[in-house]
């Protein structure tokens, strides 16, 4: 292959990659997580909700509902692994590829998986309506194959006095979880 042919080949490859990047910026990506009740020491079996994720540009919108939670605020996070075993403990820690401190969704210093709290009303299902520009359905912050975990208690957003505040938001036990899968 001559030098000119090599340069032409490299130019075609670079041009193709560049066009693909532009197309992806306008693409709508979709994912879904079926949420299961946590089973201490075992694997979940009872479905308690569905959460859909839709990404347009850099914004991911999460929309769904979960049943069976106690009224009040519950920590809502994306964890590093898509393993729902042992009462959702097998999902590992919060998704935190940059080794940041725990924080609120609007904080610049936060885990990628820190999505704050969801609120369960006194009666009825828990609505999930979250928008976030840090998580993604592609690339470095891709959450596909990772677990959504709902905690028993309120996430203090890293502002509490407990030692757990800076790592987990002191959000308590894992009560429900589900793996995010591409649609």
Swiss-Prot record:
Cofactor(s) in the UniProt record: Cu cation; Zn(2+)
EC numbers: 1.15.1.1
Positions that bind Zn(2+): 94, 102, 111, 114
Amino acids binding Cu cation: 77, 79, 94, 151
Cofactor binding notes: Binds 1 copper ion per subunit. Binds 1 zinc ion per subunit.
UniProt keyword list: Antioxidant, Copper, Disulfide bond, Glycoprotein, Metal-binding, Oxidoreductase, Secreted, Signal, Zinc
InterPro entries xref list: SOD-like_Cu/Zn_dom_sf, SOD_Cu/Zn_/chaperone, SOD_Cu/Zn_BS, SOD_Cu_Zn_dom
GO CC terms of this entry: extracellular region
Pfam families given in the database record: Sod_Cu
Function (record text): Destroys radicals which are normally produced within the cells and which are toxic to biological systems.
Descriptive protein name: Extracellular superoxide dismutase [Cu-Zn]
């Amino acid at each position: 292959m001559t030098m000119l042919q090599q340069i032409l080949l490299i130019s075609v490859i670079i041009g193709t990659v560049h066009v693909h990047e532009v197309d992806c910026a306008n693409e709508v990506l979709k994912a879904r997580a079926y949420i299961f009740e946590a089973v201490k020491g075992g694997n979940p079996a009872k479905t308690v909700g569905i959460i859909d994720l839709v990404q347009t540009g850099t914004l991911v919108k999460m929309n769904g509902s979960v049943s069976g939670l106690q009224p009040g605020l519950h920590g809502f996070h994306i964890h590093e692994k898509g393993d729902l075993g042992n009462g959702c403990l097998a999902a590992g820690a919060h998704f935190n590829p940059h080794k940041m401190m725990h924080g609120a969704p609007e904080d610049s210093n936060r885990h990628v998986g820190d999505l704050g709290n969801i609120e369960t009303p006194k009666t009825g299902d828990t609505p999930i309506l979250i928008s976030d520009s840090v998580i993604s359905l592609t690339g470095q912050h891709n959450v596909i194959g990772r677990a959504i975990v709902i905690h028993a208690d309120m996430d203090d957003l890293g502002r509490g006095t407990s030692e757990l505040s800076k790592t987990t938001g002191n959000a308590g036990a894992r009560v429900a979880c589900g793996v995010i899968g591409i649609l």
